[in-house]
Amino acid sequence: MAFDAIPKDLRGLRACLVCSLVKSFDQFETDGCENCEEFLRMKNNKDNVYDHTSNNFDGIIALTTPTDSWVAKWQRLSRFTRGIYAISVSGTLPQSTLRDMKNRGIVYKSRDRSQR
């Protein structure tokens, strides 16, 4: 896990709506999302950071060994990079992003558990 991917402060954190990676707004804008950058294109794009992340999330998980972790399997994170992840993320992706993901063959499962 690169130390620059770990949030430096607990205030103002956001979670990716696709993979639930938690970082600061500035970190998403500077580096994008390590798991989803290919199709979310958040790097150097404030609008995409706002559209594809949420500041409304519950719980956090520090994931250091995604392939060996039962928590990673439970949260569907085992194929993602090491980092800090939200347990539940509230928010919806733009329809254009959902269409793009579908066209790329990426199955989207909402990480919003607030209605359960």
UniProtKB/Swiss-Prot annotation:
For the region Interaction with Spt5, what residue ranges are annotated?
1-40
Output one GO BP term: transcription elongation by RNA polymerase II
Q: Which Pfam families match?
A: Spt4
Q: Where in the cell is it found?
A: Nucleus
KW Metal-binding (keyword) present? yes
Which GO molecular-function terms appear in the entry? protein heterodimerization activity; zinc ion binding
**Zinc finger regions, C4-type:** 16-36
Task: From the record, give the transmembrane residue ranges.
Answer: none
* Chain's role: Component of the DRB sensitivity-inducing factor complex (DSIF complex), which regulates transcription elongation by RNA polymerase II. DSIF enhances transcriptional pausing at sites proximal to the promoter, which may facilitate the assembly of an elongation competent RNA polymerase II complex. DSIF may also promote transcriptional elongation within coding regions. DSIF is required for the transcriptional induction of heat shock response genes and regulation of genes which control anterior-posterior patterning during embryonic development.
Protein name, per record: Transcription elongation factor SPT4
Origin organism is Drosophila melanogaster (Fruit fly)
